[in-house]
Amino acid sequence: MPQISPNAPLEGNVSPPPTQPHLDDNLHNGNGNGNGIHSSSSNINKHGSNINGNNDSNRSSPAKSPKRPVSSSFRIQNTSRYDNDEEDLAASEQVAGGDRQVPDYWQQRNGATTGATSGRQSRAISPGYLDNMSENSEQPPVVPLVRSKSRPEISSAAASRYNNLSYWKARRVVFYRNGDPFFPGVELRYRPGRDVTSLDNLLDKISPKMDLPRGARYVFSMDGDRKYHLDELEDGAFYVVSSFKAFKPASYGKKNGMWYASPGNQGWGSKPASRKPSIMEADLGTLSTTSGSIKRSAGRVIRIINNLDHSVQCRVLLNLRTSQPFEEVLEDLGQVLKINGAKKMYTGTGQEVRSFSQLRNEFADVDTFYLATGTALIAGSPIRRSRSRPSVVAAAPILPTDELPKVPLRGARPRSKSRPRILYAPESEILRPNGEYTMLDIMKEEPTKVTIRGLRRTFYPPVHHAPADNSPPDKKLQLQWVHGYRGIDARRNLWVLPSGELLYYVAAVAVLFDRDEDAQRHYTGHTEDIMCMDVHPSRELVASGQKAGRDRKSQAHVRIWSTESLQTLYVFGMGELDSGVTAVAFSQLNGGSYILAVDSGRESILSVWQWQWGHLLGKVATLQEGLSGAAFHPLDDNLIITHGRGHLAFWHRRKDGFFERTDIVKQPSRSHVTSVQFEPDGDVITADSDGFITIYSVDSDGAYFVRTEFEAHNKGIGCLIMLGEGTLLSGGEKDRKIAAWDSLQNYKKIADTKLPEAAGGVRTIYPQRPGRNDGNIYVGTTRNNILEGSLQRRFTQVVFGHGRQLWGLAAHPDDELYATAGHDKHVALWRKNKLIWTIQTGYECVALAFHPFGTLAAGSTEGHLLVINCENGAVMLTLRVCGSPLNCVAYNQVGDMIAMGSQNGSIYLFRVSRDGFSYKKVNKIRGSQPLTHLDWSMDGNFVQTVTIDFDLLFWDAKSLSPERSPIAMKDVKWLTNNCTVGFLVAGQWSNRYYSTTNTIVATCSRSAAHDMLASGDAEGYLRLFRYPCISPRAEFHESKVYSGMLACVRFLCGDHTLITVGGTDASLMVWDIVEE
């Protein structure tokens, strides 16, 4: 049985070395635990910031790390994170300006610090630390180093490092993804000690580029040798990066027997040179005609405008060296502007352009040209101007009408009234509030290009929109209420605190619900879903363990926090726990001084900690799949019981930290031990998935035997709880029964009761008043509800939650009401914190919409439309629209038309009566891609939708046809902005401030005042931007309380409240929007 000895140096207990030579040895040691703590003075002067070496990456263990004496393991602890951004320097100076005395930078570099500052902390057991509300730190927060103004003399020990100048040379390293032979590799060029200060720092840089399930944590050579230190990486070498410790051999860098070319270089697979194209769409974010990157003789970026419709225009890169005739180029340009047979090009002053040489020479300073089929330029009317203001520059210079020959406009196509000409803008829309934003500025605004799932999409700016502000909004989100309960996949997750509050968890939030005051408090220290929880014997502290996220900053760990102050007291397991925490439990006999944690990784490592001191007492790999729980024996703090699928074992911890295992259930066994309780004399009570309760006793030789076994329920038992008077309560998951058994009379049944079918099976039972024998209990169910009652009276609902995936959400247009619907076939109406009604419809509803007069429409996965009366929840009408799911539903502004987007890609339009209860099918507009979001235009003439591939499509509701030109639709005003793509919401994609790359925005909502944008992504992040949100530099306020996808977000009437739904446990959360 693989075991890990705990006899390793503990964090904070390493003393500083007695003499300077030990420090000199350490500076020359290649160990990555303290790597990258030196930097040349020129680098410090250049960046103006301190250097930080992240304290170890790669999760080194004592068994694999080089063994050295404690003195040689001494490390200077670096404290300030290296960054090229100048704002980090200001932040460092602000912290350093406090009351704490900070040693000089060069003194710390040369080992002149003493005490805990210079003590190397062991990463072998990754002991805990005070949290200090820092979610992403792997070490205790310390004050950044401050560089002194005058540089002292460098000691000989530190200066000796500079003798090897090759160490500071730039290195080029290529990394491959573990187990993926087709991954082309990520190339990184860096200077050790400057660009990259430690192996941890290097892994942080490449994690966003590797798309690993838990981020980059381990580095291996191509032969599988693990690299622990930055010094081990050689220039020009190739390495493999993994989230886990297991290396997978593969032909990295090869495909079909040929090596890939190095990233950034052309290899054998490069495409042959092709004929130079005459025109191509210009990437305005990277091309500049004035920067000298493209010579005038080679090509030009120009703006071309349709002479017949000035709102149709485009920026193109024109190749002046093409072999095509000028006339063919004009025809190609005409196709871009939807002009058939374009033959003429004019400047804004009416001069005709006849050749490429004129574009290079005579019209070199002209950037705007008009294309026409006739012989002259058609002038538009000038912009209306106020007499009290100076003239505003027009979008393009136009010839006076009397100087142009009159040309008949037979070829001019009719224009829609919803597409205003850009030259007829009113004065109020021409100027920004500061009076300096003219129409010329609008014309210079370039289309936005966004890359989504590897495909580039272009969104065109409307002529009139509010000014973009990239600063974060002046309001923030504050969690106000959490609806629901995690009973669908969790056990032992409901308690009653001494204050009378109910304690349970939903998503990444621990909820403390006071029924008497009708109020909630929330502990939000976790960044991913909570997987397990336990209450300290004092009932004043709580330990909760979370799962691991996709990045390295959301690692699995356990947090111990106070129920009174909601402050984090201790965190442990960072870097030690793999993919999550299966179980956590406090010891009982010694008053909760010990705590155990079981890792949900492949080895299911059991570890025991003395949490007040941060000591790891021991750990062992159980190697048990399907392990679901663990607990200390109440009469022996060194005896631990683990249970799970086909597993029940006792672990006795010896004084040396090793564990002795005794298996009670012999392998193989199909039974799943679901719960464990104890009799007052120490005998063990277990419940299993077959409905049996078993009592184990110990004989005089210390061996365990089955004393009693009986069938308590038809099928699986969800939980057991032993009350103080010796009564055992058991709850069935399948038969929904709760039974009471008298342990003093050989477990004779006292009474039983059955929960309603709508409530679900029993997941957890807890007495309402612990210590009292009144029989009142709380019950958590498998359908995410909490009930209260007793075996003598009926159960009533305390907390309602949707039992399966929750997708549908709609906000009432004129009231603080909102409705939810999910795959559990329930539709519910809420008023902020209160449930008004809930109905079971018989259909899995995924889309909701409110009629302007209060009717609720619900679209189902079977293609039905349900019309519900909001007064009483009665279903008034059921229509079969199609055979595919209705993913999005919306009424137009006046409520006389409803549009439904289907999984088959079509839009279905129905005429609606004034009261919203009568519907008549108008027609459908065929499409090809599944639709996910939908918005109506303000005038009710158009609909915009988003496909499953994030394409933005437009539909003409009057002509019942798709609108093919996104440029023609750029000035349409939309009633809502629920579509996740578009010019005014492009800043929520590929934002530079996101912690992860390739973020997929799943939902968004615009406030009624058009000043805020709420956005939710597939990783569970909720963000609040200013609206419009155009630039990828737009800043935001962020919260993360979901691990799964945030399915839908909506503002309530008045813009004071935000509602979110989603996650893996169908959680519903209410957020207050407060001043920052």
From Swiss-Prot:
Keywords of the record: Cytoplasm, Cytoskeleton, Microtubule, Repeat, WD repeat
Task: Write down the CDD domains for this protein, in alphabetical order.
Answer: DCX2_RP_like
**Which Cys pairs does UniProt list as disulfide-bonded?**
none
Instruction: Please list the GO terms describing molecular function.
Output: microtubule binding; microtubule stabilizing activity
Bias kind Low complexity: ranges = 36-55
InterPro entries xref list: Beta-prop_EML-like_2nd (IPR055442), Beta-prop_EML_1st (IPR055439), Doublecortin_dom (IPR003533), Doublecortin_dom_sf (IPR036572), HELP (IPR005108), Quinoprotein_ADH-like_sf (IPR011047), WD40/YVTN_repeat-like_dom_sf (IPR015943), WD40_repeat_dom_sf (IPR036322)
Q: Which GO terms describe its biological process?
A: adult locomotory behavior; cellular response to mechanical stimulus; intracellular signal transduction; melanotic encapsulation of foreign target; microtubule cytoskeleton organization; sensory perception of sound
Listed GO CC annotations? cytosol; microtubule; sensory dendrite
Polar residues bias locations: 70-81, 107-124
What residue stretches are annotated with the Doublecortin domain?
171-253, 300-384
SUPFAM superfamilies referenced in this protein's UniProt entry, alphabetically: Doublecortin (DC), Quinoprotein alcohol dehydrogenase-like, WD40 repeat-like
Keyword Plastid belongs to the record: no
Tell me where it resides.
Cytoplasm, Cytoskeleton
Where do the segments described as Disordered lie? 1-143
Q: Which Gene3D superfamilies does the record match to this protein? A: Doublecortin domain, YVTN repeat-like/Quinoprotein amine dehydrogenase
Q: Which residue intervals correspond to the WD repeats?
A: 525-571, 576-621, 623-661, 668-706, 712-751, 801-840, 842-878, 881-920, 926-965, 996-1035, 1041-1076
Q: Record's family?
A: Belongs to the WD repeat EMAP family.
Q: What is this protein called?
A: Echinoderm microtubule-associated protein-like CG42247
